[in-house]
Amino acid sequence: MSECPHHHPFADDPRIGYDALHAEPLTRDAHDRWVVARHRDAVAVVTDPETFSSHVSRFLQVPNGLDGAAHGEARELLDPFFSADRMAALAPLLEEVTRGLLAGVTPGQSLDAVLDLGSVYAVRAQSAWLGWPAELEPELLAWMDDNHAATRSGELSRTAVVAHRFDAIIHRLLSFRRIRKPGPPADLTDELIRVKHHDGRPLGEDEIVSVLRNWTGGDLGSLALCTGVALYWFATHPELQDELRAASDDDFDRAVDEILRIDDPFVSNRRVATVQTDLGGRQIGPGEQLVVNWTAANRDPDVFPDPDRYDPVGHAAANLVYGTGPHVCPGRPLATLELRVLLRGVLREHRVRLAPGTTPEREQPPVGGFRRVPVILDPL
């Protein structure tokens, strides 16, 4: 989950404030944590897990809160769920979800790219991937809204309550599955329940809940935010819509990655120093926390001289939207596929424009992207 100071003077566009962070190598936030904004420092932190540990959260986080051998084993066990073959098998289901969602669009009527499209698609796409029942949709949509509100507040008590609510949903799903008659796994969640550690131990209930929380709890909101950012970009850059309709999948994915670099909704991750070390000319003591601000790093003028310039090919190698190093996002293949299917589906049949008389509303730190983007999808 993204974390950084929750009071921000640049309400109209928090990226202005993030861009200002580049003036100093490191800064302190309201919680006395080091904020890492420069691209080279962000890369240095996340590629050195021995010096900068990912074991920060008070909650068990598998695999993103693990280090060393435990993290390596978790990735070996879980990364196959995102294999190319699995993504190819999932694609037709996502196409079906997209068709069903877009069939409900009324021509000429304003809808919110984040809530009406992004959030609903995120829940339906993740449910299709995991084999979760459609009846969960209202509960998951309500949870997403409450989770963003709690994160926005910066109050640990509120975020803890929301986290426990999501864990309760997962426990309920798991209990239903465990009372079923034995047989081959019916879906991906069934497969996950049967995963075993390298020494033969089955994953514990707390580990399974953590994995599913990581896969869904964060990704539901992130996918909705990405949808809002992408459709806002399409609406404000109409010439790109025609270009992307004719693009190959690889070119389309690079374009979306670049849009997300320019306006990265994955704001930050934390690390904690394990030893005394120097970073950007600052002395970091053991036990001190760092907030790696991905949004700022992806707009570092030392790497991207004009951060708002759209260059999918030229900027690809330095793009940090999905992180880098041993903790590079394992779910990138899934997120890329989900976004491609939805956004291609939108562009295949529609031209996107901002709804007249409305103003998109930015999310506020520590959440990125937009809270609402009113758009109209005009039939081609």
Language-model region placement:
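Cytochrome P450
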Residues: 1-380
